[in-house]
């Protein structure tokens, strides 16, 4: 990593996104208010500008024999591999890509994959980088809560967001 050469996003971009999400979320409970408050207070330093998929979730990764195929690339509010990492973390935490198949409930295979992914993050990123990724994951949760209409899926999201937030520094409990 050549951190000195990396360009980072200005804090204002994150402040605007958080404000937009806050404005659009209806029925803010105590947990959502705490998450939004934490996002507003966060420094948002050192989020690198980079090439990014934009919507890297398990739904957008196809496996064909030994090949991985990435589909549904999209523009997001930032282009950063941190955002891609956060979206995968979001997906593993709440099994969002599998919400129609098992009501968002995890299973042994998904839990094992999630644990391997969390270990990958812990082994390859420092504490500040992981905190940035986790904070972006909180934004991912709020973004999806904004457009989710199904009450069961909304409960799934809110419960998993609370679990992540309440156990922010203990990845074993995500």
Regions found by a protein language model. Give the residues of each.
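Regulatory N- and C-terminal appendages and interdomain linkers associated
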Residues: 30, 132-136, 140-174
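Acidic carboxylate-rich catalytic motifs and surrounding loops in phosphoryl-/glycosyl-chemistry enzymes
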Residues: 8-12, 128-138
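Phosphate/pyrophosphate-binding loops and the adjoining catalytic core of nucleotide-dependent enzymes
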Residues: 1-4, 113-117, 121, 130, ...
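Active-site acidic catalytic loop and adjacent metal/ATP-binding pocket
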Residues: 38-83
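An alpha-helical support segment within catalytic cores of ATP-dependent transferases
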Residues: 2-52
